[in-house]
Amino acid sequence: NTKGDGKEGDEFWTKAETLLYCALVAYIVFEGPEEERNMNTLVEMINSMEVREDDESFKNAVDYMFDGLAKRNPQHFAVRQYAKYKLASGKTAKSILISCGARLAPFDIAELREIMSYDELELDKLGDEKTALFFLISDTDSTYNFIVALAFSQMFNLLCERADNKYGGRLPHHVRVLWDEAANTGQVPGLEKIVAVIRSREISLTLFYQAMSQCKALYKDHAETIMGNMDNIVFLGG
């Protein structure tokens, strides 16, 4: 949802970014205080990761954080991932950081940082009692639309986990997701798998598209699987 409309670049950079994200997120989740477990902390860590091409021995603040963690727990998942990232030379590491910064640029917007600073949605509890939750997006400005896809992705995962771990596999209250403008809210990773398993957890999904081609544009070969898991397909002629 943040790679833009251009062609996919070298897969190496995407994998390198993912490696760094894994290290930093693991540190934040397992070592950081609860109030700092958010996207803002991730962005700040990346912003503070200075790299000097002419001085391979230079260490930034994040390097020292991981050095301390490595001394306490050398087998920590975050430490092991960060060590792999540090295999990159100064020039390569700088390119990785630039790619991360460009991808996460929207999270530098003050309004978005405020939204990401704390959790007030409690998406995992939507099936505990009767609740109505609305996501409103602009139909002319797509800047923040990816947040809805992010929220949906987390919501489905959290609700399935809660159904399995707390309620024996089924939520006490059915959660019905009416996803209008599905083509304009970004892609939910693994949606083709999600739609196949949520029904048993008392979750249903209704997707609204202007045309079938919109679903295919977003999910490519998985679009057929997504549509195949829908009980009904309704077409309203223009």
Language-model features: locations:
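Conserved ATP-driven motor cores of ASCE-family P-loop NTPases powering translocation/secretion/packaging/pilus
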Residues: 195-238
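P-loop NTPase motor domains
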Residues: 1-203, 218
